[in-house]
Regions:
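N-terminal amphipathic, basic helical "cap/leader" segment at the start of enzyme domains
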Residues: 1-91, 177
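Short beta-strand-to-loop capping motifs
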Residues: 52, 98-100, 156-158
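C-terminal helix-cap and adjacent tail motif
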Residues: 6-9, 25, 82-83, 150-177
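Short coil/turn connectors at secondary-structure junctions
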Residues: 91-94, 121, 146-150
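Small-aliphatic-rich amphipathic alpha-helix that forms the alpha element of a beta-alpha
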Residues: 33-34, 96-141
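Short, hinge-like loop/turn segments at secondary-structure boundaries
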Residues: 67, 140-144
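Short glycine/proline-enriched turns and hinge-like loops at secondary-structure junctions
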Residues: 41-43, 107, 165-167
Length: 177
């Protein structure tokens, strides 16, 4: 698969096979994400924390959901908290958390998703647990270095289903002459 195919065919996967992902494969994808994007800060300032096991990850997701319900004001951006059957990590067998400077983690996260897709794996970048992930107690529990900020929470696994591409709008392009 070439990079253009990967960009146009990658989908956010929200339904995963229970088949575990091999650690060697996870490490290869992390290597791609850590070594290939140019670092914004001129160094390699991030960490990758890997969670494995559907039940264990679901328990962390329930903690994140409880934190969101207990700690945040109501509003349309928080409607996901009350959706029946909502799962923070979508039943994924692996979640990778990238922590560090925002610019670097976003580059690493996108590269991670494309590398996984090229290897037949599905991903979904989830934003719902981010405030929970940034609490001192959660960072300690997940062994995220205290001085780093979690930026990317990426579900990873073999897709059970692959959704169709949604309709896309043309981007707003402003030529400055």
């Amino acid at each position: 698969m070439d990079v253009i195919d990967a960009i146009h065919t990658r989908r956010s996967i929200r339904s995963y096979s229970p088949h575990p992902v091999e650690r060697d494969l996870i490490e290869e994808i992390i290597w791609d994400a850590a070594q290939t994007p140019p670092p914004f800060s001129g160094q390699v300032p991030w960490t990758f924390n890997v969670l494995e096991g559907v039940e264990r990850i679901a328990a962390f997701g329930n903690e994140a959901l409880k934190y969101a319900r207990d700690s945040h004001p109501a509003g349309p951006e928080w409607d996901w908290r009350n959706r029946p059957g909502f799962q923070v990590f979508w039943g994924a067998p692996v979640v990778v958390i990238i922590s560090g400077p925002v610019e670097d983690c976003c580059r690493a996260g996108q590269t991670f998703m494309l590398s996984a897709h090229a290897r037949g794996l599905g991903t979904c970048w989830v934003g719902s647990p981010m405030l929970w992930l940034r609490t001192a107690s959660t960072k300690a529990k997940l062994r995220i270095p205290a001085q780093l900020m979690p930026v990317s929470a990426l579900c990873l696994g073999y897709p059970a289903t692959i959704p169709e591409a949604p309709p896309r709008k043309r981007p707003s392009i402003i030529w400055v002459e």
